[in-house]
Amino acid sequence: MNPSAGGILSPDHAAALPPGPAQDALLKAVTTEISDKGFVLASVDAVVNWARTGSLWPMTFGLACCAVEMMHAGCSRYDMDRFGVVFRPSPRQSDLMIVAGTLTNKMAPALRRVYDQMAEPRWVISMGSCANGGGYYHYSYSVVRGCDRIVPVDIYVPGCPPSAEALMYGILQLQKKIRRTGSILR
């Protein structure tokens, strides 16, 4: 694999490669470029997005039974730390909010307040049927019919409750979305 004019970290190579020959070839190309030139050519967007995808810090907003599956995903069996996902207790330290469960009308202002306390860039994952659209309680007078009416949602994870694997898949989809976005204004 020869480095292109755009550098090793061009948008074509920005996606994470699974272990194997393709990853070995990429690592060899990076090592060769560093030893030849002493530096690696990359766009600032690719480096910033690579750092953001590898260090998502979610703040949990567990409202109902979906929160149990969210805790399950954070435990040792699924080990979200290997994807750079480390749960944080404060919204000021977080860049991802996972809304898991039924959002009531009384809880909606608190959700918005916590979202506003998060630093930019920030993302939201809506987890479960209740957070996505009201779910089982859709016709109740006290339920918000989807948290996207209160905060902008990036990824929807369906299910009642969704499995830990579904949440992991949603986080991986969010990482893909972050890789595709441009973060530096031109």
UniProtKB/Swiss-Prot annotation:
Entry-linked SUPFAM superfamilies: HydA/Nqo6-like
Name listed for the protein in its UniProt record: NADH-quinone oxidoreductase subunit B
Gene3D superfamilies: 3.40.50.12280
PANTHER family: NADH DEHYDROGENASE (PTHR11995), NADH DEHYDROGENASE [UBIQUINONE] IRON-SULFUR PROTEIN 7, MITOCHONDRIAL (PTHR11995:SF14)
Protein family per UniProt: Belongs to the complex I 20 kDa subunit family.
The keyword 4Fe-4S is assigned to this record: yes
Free-text function comment from the UniProt entry: NDH-1 shuttles electrons from NADH, via FMN and iron-sulfur (Fe-S) centers, to quinones in the respiratory chain. Couples the redox reaction to proton translocation (for every two electrons transferred, four hydrogen ions are translocated across the cytoplasmic membrane), and thus conserves the redox energy in a proton gradient.
Residue stretches in coiled coil: none
GO biological process, one term: electron transport coupled proton transport
UniProt-listed Enzyme Commission number(s): 7.1.1.-
Needed cofactors: [4Fe-4S] cluster
Primary location group: membrane
Keyword flag Glycosyltransferase: no
Reaction(s) this enzyme catalyzes, per UniProt: a quinone + NADH + 5 H(+)(in) = a quinol + NAD(+) + 4 H(+)(out)
Gene: nuoB
NCBIfam families: nuoB_fam, PRK06411.1
Quaternary structure note: NDH-1 is composed of 14 different subunits. Subunits NuoB, C, D, E, F, and G constitute the peripheral sector of the complex.
Keywords: 4Fe-4S, Cell inner membrane, Cell membrane, Iron, Iron-sulfur, Membrane, Metal-binding, NAD, Quinone, Translocase, Transport, Ubiquinone
Top EC class, one word: translocase
GO terms, molecular function: 4 iron, 4 sulfur cluster binding; iron ion binding; NADH dehydrogenase (ubiquinone) activity; NADH:ubiquinone reductase (non-electrogenic) activity; quinone binding
PROSITE patterns on file: COMPLEX1_20K
Membrane topology type: Peripheral membrane protein
InterPro entries the record matches: NADH_UbQ_OxRdtase-like_20kDa, NADH_UQ_OxRdtase_20Kd_su
